[in-house]
Amino acid sequence: MDLAGLLKSQFLCHLVFCYVFIASGLIINTVQLFTLLLWPINKQLFRKINCRLSYCISSQLVMLLEWWSGTECTIFTDPRAYPKYGKENAIVVLNHKFEIDFLCGWSLSERFGLLGGSKVLAKKELAYVPIIGWMWYFTEMVFCSRKWEQDRKTVATSLQHLRDYPEKYFFLIHCEGTRFTEKKHEISMQVARAKGLPRLKHHPLPRTKGFAITVRSLRNVVSAVYDCTLNFRNNENPTLLGVLNGKKYHADLYVRRIPLEDIPEDDDRCSAWLHKLYQEKDAFQEEYYRTGTFPETPMVPPRRPWTLVNWLFWASLVLYPFFQFLVSMIRSGSSLTLASFILVFFVASMGVRWMIGVTEIDKGSAYGNSDSKQKQND
């Protein structure tokens, strides 16, 4: 391990990142709270401000991926479609297999200049996660309870609110509804056999209702669906802790642009279309495992400096008073004060570890572990 790699693996560096993220995140969340005063006066101004405040938080995690760990991303796509990326609203359908697939989705949004306004269809519990969940609330993320009778109304209403959103955005949706595990996959394939659907080797069955209502609600606002299939070279299974430790990965992302007018408007036909899409995604994934590459032309969208600039700004803003406070405590010589400081720092680091745990596969939700629930929510 070289000197840089040794430095990146040090717990002290991780504490610095944790402190900057927590301190800046809570400051930004507080500012977002006060922006609620703008909502009844000027809703679009509220949205533009929160779009930029959201960037200040989410870009810190993208900075860790792109600049700290040095993870690279190669996009395989049609060169004729590439110029449209970042210039239009799009629904992004991304496979949900890796612990950092959401971070790769953010990186894609950042490289095309849409990170601040990016949206996602997320489980309702995430709205209560400090900093990121609260940030999502203020940027009008669409939350679902995974109970269709409730979601058919609440999700549709939330999506309708995005029809006049003033910023360009990618709307990310994991149609599988849950992260891939062997157990969930086997249960899903039991449902596939019961429904007479082809077996998928690398994906669970997609949940079609959420996709259909998203397409229906955003039609004539969103220009296309971006079918994205993610994999990592050398058969690696990256983790957020690995990124924090500075481990470098190389992501390969196959992106197909599908005009929204090519997707059926009827819900049943739209569901059949999505099942066919996932059969194609499965074939692309199988080809990747066999050949180590995806179809189409490989391209590397350049990383932008703004994630690093943003982190340096917040680091200088919150670290300087912190070190002043630390020096004053050391000079005071009070054992009780120092012990209290260490306790607070320990609790903060455990809090960040808990937030990281939300992304870990072995600590993921039980959603998808019951075939009866899958049949109900498909």
From Swiss-Prot:
SUPFAM superfamilies for the chain: Glycerol-3-phosphate (1)-acyltransferase
Cellular localization per UniProt: Endoplasmic reticulum membrane
Transmembrane regions listed in the UniProt entry: 11-31, 125-145, 307-327, 338-358
BP GO terms, sorted: CDP-diacylglycerol biosynthetic process
Recorded catalytic activity of this chain's protein: a 1-acyl-sn-glycero-3-phosphate + an acyl-CoA = a 1,2-diacyl-sn-glycero-3-phosphate + CoA; (4Z,7Z,10Z,13Z,16Z,19Z)-docosahexaenoyl-CoA + 1-hexadecanoyl-sn-glycero-3-phosphate = 1-hexadecanoyl-2-(4Z,7Z,10Z,13Z,16Z,19Z-docosahexaenoyl)-sn-glycero-3-phosphate + CoA; 1-octadecanoyl-sn-glycero-3-phosphate + (9Z,12Z)-octadecadienoyl-CoA = 1-octadecanoyl-2-(9Z,12Z-octadecadienoyl)-sn-glycero-3-phosphate + CoA; 1-octadecanoyl-sn-glycero-3-phosphate + (4Z,7Z,10Z,13Z,16Z,19Z)-docosahexaenoyl-CoA = 1-octadecanoyl-2-(4Z,7Z,10Z,13Z,16Z,19Z-docosahexaenoyl)-sn-glycero-3-phosphate + CoA
Record key words, sorted: Acyltransferase, Endoplasmic reticulum, Lipid biosynthesis, Lipid metabolism, Membrane, Phospholipid biosynthesis, Phospholipid metabolism, Transferase, Transmembrane, Transmembrane helix
Cited InterPro entries: Acyltransf_C, Plipid/glycerol_acylTrfase
Enzyme class, UniProt record, top EC level: transferase
Cysteines joined through disulfide linkages: none
GO MF term list: 1-acylglycerol-3-phosphate O-acyltransferase activity
Main location: endoplasmic reticulum
GO CC list: endoplasmic reticulum; endoplasmic reticulum membrane; mitochondrial outer membrane
Sequence motif HXXXXD motif, location on chain: 96-101
Family: Belongs to the 1-acyl-sn-glycerol-3-phosphate acyltransferase family.
The record's note on its domains: The HXXXXD motif is essential for acyltransferase activity and may constitute the binding site for the phosphate moiety of the glycerol-3-phosphate.
Annotated protein name in UniProt: 1-acyl-sn-glycerol-3-phosphate acyltransferase delta
Protein species of origin: Macaca fascicularis (Crab-eating macaque)
Gene it is expressed from: AGPAT4
